[in-house]
Design a protein with these regions (language model features):
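NAD(P)-dependent short-chain dehydrogenase/reductase
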Residues: 128-132, 155-215
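N-terminal Rossmann-like NAD(P)+-binding domain of SDR-like oxidoreductases, especially those catalyzing
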Residues: 1-176
């Protein structure tokens, strides 16, 4: 059995880079796609096969067909809720159209069952959860364009299963934290609080302090 190949989108980002390091240590041949709009080259190993491309570029389909991956781990996204509210067309273009571009590349591969893992939006697809903790069967009620675009991709995956037999999984991560996380973002609450504490800055908590951050 030959070496397996993994394609990771958003490979230079916080989570994507950790996945790349793990896959390499597990013996995979790894190719990454990232336009470096938020990812950093310093996050990935020297000599790593990184293709600088936007998810919406036609070349993404060519890369998928070229490398014939055994598994695609899809993390690249427009990830700001605030940006999605200001520019919902941009958000949908990147998160929905960009993902469809990637899926069409997978669909073009013949005689190979590619595993597709979509890293979705975490808890935002639930909106205001009706029960806590929310599990996979909990009702979804997106309240932002970002949440709607990520949920839209989730609904496309079973369609691609019918179209081309796509083997797919969806992962909704909540409150991920760790090394290489950007402490300046809007959602990395652990990194933001840690940076404030290290800098002896006040922690800003909105509301009455009873809000629950995770799901």
């Amino acid at each position: 059995i030959g070496q397996k190949t993994a394609l990771v989108t958003g490979a230079a980002g916080f989570i994507g880079s950790h996945i790349c390091h793990r896959l390499i240590s597990d013996g995979y041949s790894v190719v990454g796609i990232d336009n470096l709009s938020s990812g950093k080259l310093s996050n990935i190993p020297a000599g790593f096969d990184l293709r600088n491309a936007d998810l919406r570029d036609p070349i993404v389909r060519e890369i998928v067909v070229e490398i014939q991956p055994d598994v695609v781990l899809h993390l690249a996204a427009q990830m700001s809720v605030a940006v999605s509210a200001r520019e919902p067309l941009l958000d949908a273009d990147i998160n929905v159209v960009g993902t469809l571009n990637l899926l069409e590349g997978v669909r073009a591969i013949e005689d190979k069952n590619v595993k597709f893992v979509h890293f979705s939006s975490g808890g935002t697809v639930y909106g205001e959860p009706t029960c806590l903790p929310a599990d996979e069967a909990a009702p979804v009620h997106p309240l932002s364009p970002y949440a709607a675009s990520k949920l839209a991709v989730e609904t496309y995956l079973p369609i691609y299963e019918r179209l081309c037999g796509l083997d797919h999984s969806v992962i909704r991560l909540g409150n991920v934290y760790g090394p290489r996380q950007d402490p300046h973002g809007e959602a990395g609450v652990v990194a933001i609080f840690a940076k404030a504490m290290l800098g002896k800055s006040p922690l800003k908590i909105f509301g009455d302090g009873t809000d629950e951050r995770d799901y």
